[in-house]
Amino acid sequence: MKRLLIQLLVMLALPSVVNSSHLNNQRELTVTSESTKESIELAKYLKDTGVVKYSAYWCPNCLNQSELFGKQAYRELNVVECARDGINSQTQLCIDKKIKGFPTWEKMEN
């Protein structure tokens, strides 16, 4: 029983270890995957149509979504950092927008 409990704890902890490996001491996400042509086109479309991603550098789901886009496409996105201690933090904007969870996507009105 003790061995089973240890295995379960290791399995539960592993995803957070993997996700945290993409975080650096500079308080920003580090996207490492390569983008596809389609993901770059999608990111440009989202940017051009006023879609904004509210994110936090420590958020595992934010990282997972960013990795799906890849590093080239990620640079095209409109991303607002909501964590107070994040690089280029816009915490007050996140508070004003009533962002409660991460990631949150919003289509800005023109």
Language-model features: locations:
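Positively charged n-region of N-terminal signal peptides that target proteins for export
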Residues: M1-L4
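Bacterial N-terminal signal peptides
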Residues: L8-P15
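Short, intrinsically disordered/low-complexity patches at protein termini
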Residues: P15, L77-N78
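Boundary at the C-terminal end of the N-terminal hydrophobic targeting segment
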Residues: V18-S20
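Transition segment at domain starts
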Residues: N25-E38
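Local sequence-structure signature of Cys/Sec-based thiol-disulfide redox active-site neighborhoods
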Residues: S35-E76
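Thioredoxin-like thiol-disulfide oxidoreductase module
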Residues: S66-G70, N78-F102, E106-M108
